[in-house]
């Protein structure tokens, strides 16, 4: 009697088990943090803010961003790190040579990761793991990625951790430099609430 294994078919696929390990990959590895953050919770934060930015752009500024595509870009944007780990930003962007090599490593990790899916499912997932970096949705997701880092800075500063002062200023300048009206709207309407306590939020 032939089994799937003897037919050359796999019984086990590791893709989602790999992604579940995102909760073990710590962000900000060179920084002292009052609370550790992993790439799984970071990706959730990026997905929420990505959806918000798309809604703002489409509703208030006449945009036509594909919200579903943008949010799925956010969900998968850190998945390569289950194989590479989180390389500190100062190292990743130290020079163009290192940046280029790391991009190649990320691409290889993504290819290996997608290969752990059944062949018939890869076409449904791969477009979000390998995001179109020239698309409007990708640009929105990258802004949301920066917002998620900015929110982390606010959290650390509220906890008395001055280690994040420079990062906060740098990220804020980067976000404003993008000249995206949806980014400015999010800054004005939503960011102030991130600095409130729970009691203050409930009293609004």
Label each PLM-derived region with a short phrase.
Residues 1-204:
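Alpha-helical, largely C-terminal catalytic domains
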């Amino acid at each position: 009697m032939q089994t799937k294994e003897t037919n050359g078919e796999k019984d086990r696929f590791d893709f989602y088990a790999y992604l579940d390990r995102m909760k073990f990959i710590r962000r900000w590895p060179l920084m002292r943090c009052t609370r550790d953050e992993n790439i799984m919770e970071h990706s959730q934060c990026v997905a929420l803010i990505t959806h918000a930015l798309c809604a703002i752009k489409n509703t208030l500024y006449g945009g036509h961003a594909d919200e579903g595509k943008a949010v799925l870009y956010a969900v998968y944007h850190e998945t390569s790190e289950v194989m590479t780990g989180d390389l500190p930003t100062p190292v990743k962007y130290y020079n163009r040579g290192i940046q280029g090599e790391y991009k190649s490593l990320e691409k290889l990790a993504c290819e290996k990761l997608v290969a752990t899916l059944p062949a018939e499912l890869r076409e449904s997932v791969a477009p979000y793991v390998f995001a179109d970096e020239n698309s409007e949705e990708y640009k929105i997701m990258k802004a949301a990625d920066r917002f998620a880092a900015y929110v982390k800075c606010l959290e650390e500063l509220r906890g008395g951790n001055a280690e994040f002062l420079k990062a906060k200023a740098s990220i804020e300048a980067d976000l404003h430099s993008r000249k995206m009206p949806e980014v400015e709207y999010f800054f004005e309407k939503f960011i102030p609430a991130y600095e409130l306590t729970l009691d203050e939020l409930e009293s609004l």
